[in-house]
Swiss-Prot record:
Keywords: Electron transport, Heme, Iron, Membrane, Metal-binding, Mitochondrion, Mitochondrion inner membrane, Respiratory chain, Transmembrane, Transmembrane helix, Transport, Ubiquinone. One of its GO terms (cellular component) is mitochondrial inner membrane. It is found in: Mitochondrion inner membrane. GO terms for biological process: mitochondrial electron transport, ubiquinol to cytochrome c. Belongs to the cytochrome b family. It comes from Ochotona koslowi. Heme b b562 binds at H83, H182. This is Cytochrome b. A ubiquinone binds at H201. Its cofactor is heme b.
Amino acid sequence: MTNIRKTHPLMKIINHSLIDLPAPSNISAWWNFGSLLGLCLGIQIITGLFLAMHYTSDTLTAFSSVTHICRDVNYGWIIRYMHANGASMFFICLFLHVGRGIYYGSYTYSETWNIGILLLFTVMATAFMGYVLPWGQMSFWGATVITNLLSAIPYIGTDLVQWIWGGFSVDKATLTRFFAFHFILPFIITALVMVHLLFLHETGSNNPTGIISDADKIPFHPYYTIKDAFGFLLLISLLLTLVLFSPDLLGDPDNYTPANPLNTPPHIKPEWYFLFAYAILRSIPNKLGGVLALILSIAILAAMPLLHTSKQRSMMFRPISQTLFWILVADLLTLTWIGGQPVEHPFIIIGQLASFFYFFLILILMPTSSLIENKLLKW
């Protein structure tokens, strides 16, 4: 009798994705982040669902409903902090996952890569709207500043902002719709993840060498199921350590003050995972230019396959490209630091230089270094 997992229509899908999937024999821990992102998404949906049971999306009660969750709901505090810090874990895994894709040339699977970029934008939008929901000072002013950027769009900008706000300022209508979108988007993300995996399984996984590995494949189960399970254990340990020992480490103290439209906080800044993009936005003195740079800072990933000039796929055997890649990482860390600093000397010029180098590295230096490495291959 044939095994049920190979015949049953539903089990067959699971079998081909998680059990009998042929996987390269040499993929390293950098390939764990896909499954870790799946775990993060699961944690966020489950904790978010339980939070939504007690949360009220009204300007008068939103802040106190979050306080109520933390104080009165059974284990509400851990659910709330798992959700808040789970978002940070989500973005850590996302950045490492994208970084892996750039380093090992995974972007040559263009459909998988493009769906990934779409996922990144969607997750960023979801996180932004989620940050508005507790209705603290930084929630309110963050929402005001970021939505206001749309007014830079010529002709329709002002109308568009008022349409998104549902009025003439960030108010009850804005909070209610943000809650609605924040609730629905994770399910759209889940659907996109399935499409992402569908395209990935069309080609099979890349590997550190960047060489086609069809001749040397191993079954996903048990080799990579156990490896993923170990990754899950590490991620959950890290998340629980953060939640139980310093849950507010990555948050902003201003968000423990209820939203007040009459009092602007001294430094308006987003959560840490948006600081690099925020620094790029602020480095351009023109509003529309800043908005375009902000969008391009992520959208530039779509140009990666076009900018690939090397004869080798992976950076594993390309020391010049490796050096530039790590300079890019250092540049992004610099931008993250600058995004959290006040707009004054010397931070302004550091931010402008770091923003310039971010685009210069990706658009000019990395493709050029690849061409030089191609020449060196002939020596």
